[in-house]
Amino acid sequence: MPSFDIVSKVDMQEVDNAINQTVKEIAQRYDFKGSKCEVTLEKESIKVLADDDFKLKAVIDILQSKFVKRNISPKSLQYGKAEQASGSMVRQIITLQVGISKEKAKEIGQVIKETKLKVQSQIQDDQLRVTGKNIDDLQEVIRVLKGKDLDIDMQFVNFRS
């Protein structure tokens, strides 16, 4: 029976490269001269430290542009609240979304059911498996899910016929 898996994963090497490029650009830009802006990767979160809210926003814009250039979806980033750090610094934690949560999996399953195609979806840990008798139905499910804005970065893998 044909099937495929829906997963949400991020290439950590590309994330590391994007962060390194961001740090390099911050060091070279004139508007960041003399500032103490930092971007660090800690397991599955990114810590951004800046002098003020304006510089924090600028650093995050640079980071997002580097992510897009490296084919990492901005949907895979979850932004925490900007908070005061030591001194006059501002800190923001950005979490990388790896895996599909149970709530998102249920939401995706509901979207699949609404298509009224003859396919079944089942939640397996942090991924979703979709099976059906017809490959065309599975391709239609992929098309529908790509068209929906579900606020999650999805990849479709293990397409078996």
From Swiss-Prot:
GO MF, any single term: nucleotide binding
Keywords, comma-separated and alphabetical: Nucleotide-binding
Source organism superkingdom: Bacteria
The UniProt record lists the keyword Mitochondrion: no
UniProt keyword Nucleotide-binding, yes or no: yes
GO CC entries: cytosol
Protein family: Belongs to the YajQ family.
Function: Nucleotide-binding protein.
Protein name: Nucleotide-binding protein GM21_0633
Organism: Geobacter sp. (strain M21)
